């Protein structure tokens, strides 16, 4: 007997006559509809002690900054929580947006059920931090993640944290971070002993000059002197945020952007990962504009962006190169599509899996321009015919741009 598939349409199709011609409007149906569920995940944590320690470290990152008073800092402990693809991901930025941290609870790190894929943003108050700090290695801890709250259940007690607004600065930061991470390369892997040796060379106090991660024989070290294959690190003292976790780490992997725009420090605790990304300088946050602009220049139909959003939601992750091959799409087009989803905060990047993962946030294409005002300004100049190309030979472009007050600028790229 043949299988029967039932389709339910939200509206009727219609044939209408207008301006002496017939217009057919077909009702749309999609098998990939985003559902609203009261709970995304419910289950036990198999490594509750290390998961708790990583979440506390994440909260410390969110609380950290280099330009706020202690009173202002105490108000900041808001992680983004994503449940999907058998993984729990907790993310956050320092207030200066120059440090990004993420906790990944992998499939073996929990024993639970994913009822729906989703993302929420909650405030980890003192009650949650205290509950996390009291968890021991042998305890049975249950966690729930829903669209409006995150819950922690232990010893017959529960702590519930409610959803709070997601800062716009964070959405801008998420865009830059995933772009930098998607091109980062693994430079070093260290075992626990090497990791502890490395951090023993971390200088005290605030470091104002660049330092380098170098190898001295089999021992890694931080040095103010550059050497071959060294990794450049600005604001080295920010790595102290990792120190509480170092005694428990099985391994440390260090990744770097090809032009050292960021470094990523990833600690492993069995089925739990903690990663810390540093911007090039203390004063330079990931929320600054620029990283996504080149990928956003190419015009892409909005229907393609919507299709990519549905594909990402359905699969929860994808490798851009494989996606381009499988779907017969030019890789540059995939980069442009990925950049647009990232500009809405919808994509993150997993370095170990070399793939994007999906955050379920509101799909608002207008957010792309609102978070990238340089694009708006550039498009306005073009619309007002204030850009004149003088020369363009493929390697060099010279243009005259009319600015405010009629001042003409020469721009050479």
Protein language model features and the residues they cover:
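Long, low-complexity, compositionally biased intrinsically disordered regions
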Residues: 1-413
């Amino acid at each position: 007997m043949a299988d029967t598939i039932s389709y339910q349409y939200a509206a009727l199709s219609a044939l209408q006559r207008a301006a002496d011609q017939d217009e057919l409007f077909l009702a749309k149906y999609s098998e990939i509809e985003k559902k609203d569920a009261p709970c995304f995940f419910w289950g036990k944590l198999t490594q509750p002690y290390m998961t708790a320690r990583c979440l506390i470290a994440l909260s410390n990152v969110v609380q950290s900054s280099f330009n706020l008073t202690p009173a202002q800092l105490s108000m900041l402990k808001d992680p983004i929580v994503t449940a999907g693809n058998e993984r729990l991901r907790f993310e956050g930025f320092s207030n200066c947006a120059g440090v990004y941290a993420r906790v990944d609870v992998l499939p073996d790190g929990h024993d639970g059920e994913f009822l729906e894929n989703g993302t929420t943003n909650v405030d980890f108050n003192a009650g949650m931090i205290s509950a996390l700090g009291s968890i021991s290695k042998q305890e049975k801890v249950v966690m729930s993640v829903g669209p409006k709250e995150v819950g922690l259940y232990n010893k017959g007690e529960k702590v519930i944290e409610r959803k709070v607004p997601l800062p716009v600065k964070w959405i801008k930061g998420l865009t830059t971070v995933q772009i930098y991470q998607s091109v980062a390369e693994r430079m070093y892997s260290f075992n626990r002993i090497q990791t502890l040796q490395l951090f023993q060379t971390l200088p005290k106090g605030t470091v104002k000059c660049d330092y380098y991660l170098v190898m001295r024989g089999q021992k890694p070290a931080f040095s103010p002197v550059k050497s071959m294959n060294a990794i450049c690190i600005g604001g080295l003292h920010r790595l102290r945020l990792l120190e509480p976790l170092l005694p428990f780490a099985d391994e440390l992997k260090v990744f770097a952007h090809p032009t050292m725009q960021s470094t990523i420090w990833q600690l492993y605790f069995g089925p739990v990962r903690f990663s810390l990304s540093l911007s090039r300088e203390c004063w330079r946050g990931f929320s600054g504009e620029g990283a996504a602009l080149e990928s956003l220049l190419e015009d892409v139909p909005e229907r393609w962006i919507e299709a990519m959003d549905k594909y990402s939601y359905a699969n929860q992750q994808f490798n851009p190169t494989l996606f381009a091959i499988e779907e017969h799409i030019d890789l540059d087009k995939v980069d442009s599509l990925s950049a647009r989803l990232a500009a809405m905060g919808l994509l993150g990047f997993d370095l170990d899996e070399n793939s994007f993962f999906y955050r379920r946030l509101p799909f608002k294409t207008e957010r792309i321009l609102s978070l990238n005002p340089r694009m708006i300004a550039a498009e306005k100049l073009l619309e007002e015919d204030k850009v004149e190309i003088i020369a363009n030979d493929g390697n060099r472009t010279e243009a005259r741009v009319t600015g405010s007050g009629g001042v003409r600028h020469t721009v050479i790229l």
